């Protein structure tokens, strides 16, 4: 790859910037599923992660994300918390039943995500920290099946 992309959020606007490849470690190829009701965020996540060699599936709703996870082998899931129809908590519960070994990263622009929702995921990233934390968290989670043990009780 000739360059990598960096995601930055400034004044609520997601920006994509090219960066030299030498600033990022090589990551293992994997299939990632991104679920977010904001199409612009999905496109930025997809471009960013594909620049590192990941195969990225995207879904604008929780039900579409679950449908994709049932049809494809998914190695890791990235889901927004605040979405219409199904929120990230509901998606995480269903995803754990569908893909119990796939780590789940929850994203949110707000920090008031209920503790109960966080029990179903392996990591939480505030959207304003996405640029600096997404790749390190993916790298850590890809090195193990789950970051912490789960009881998976609703």
Q: Which ranges hold each PLM region?
A:
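Receiver (REC) domain active-site loop signature in two-component systems and cognate sites
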Residues: 83
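Active-site residues of response regulator receiver
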Residues: 80
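Conserved acidic segment of CheY-like receiver
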Residues: 28-40, 45-49, 77
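Helix N-cap/capping motif at the beta->alpha junctions
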Residues: 58-67, 88
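His-Asp phosphorelay/catalytic-motif detector in bacterial-type signaling
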Residues: 73-75, 99-103
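Short amphipathic alpha-helix used as the core "switch/output" element in two-component signaling
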Residues: 67, 89-100
């Amino acid at each position: 790859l000739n360059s990598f992309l960096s995601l930055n959020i400034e004044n609520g606007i997601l920006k994509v910037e090219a960066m030299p490849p030498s600033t990022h470690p090589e990551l293992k190829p994997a299939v990632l599923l991104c679920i977010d009701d904001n199409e612009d965020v999905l496109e930025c996540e997809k471009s960013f992660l594909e620049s590192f060699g990941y195969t990225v599936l995207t879904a604008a709703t929780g039900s579409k994300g679950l449908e994709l996870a049932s049809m494809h082998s998914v190695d890791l899931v990235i889901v927004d918390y605040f979405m219409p129809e199904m929120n990230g908590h509901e998606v995480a519960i269903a995803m754990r039943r569908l893909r119990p070994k796939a780590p789940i990263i929850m994203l949110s622009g707000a920090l008031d995500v209920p503790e109960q929702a966080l029990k179903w995921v392996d990591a939480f990233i505030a959207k304003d920290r996405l640029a600096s934390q997404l790749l390190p968290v993916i790298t850590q989670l890809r090195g193990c099946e789950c970051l912490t043990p789960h009881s998976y009780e609703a």
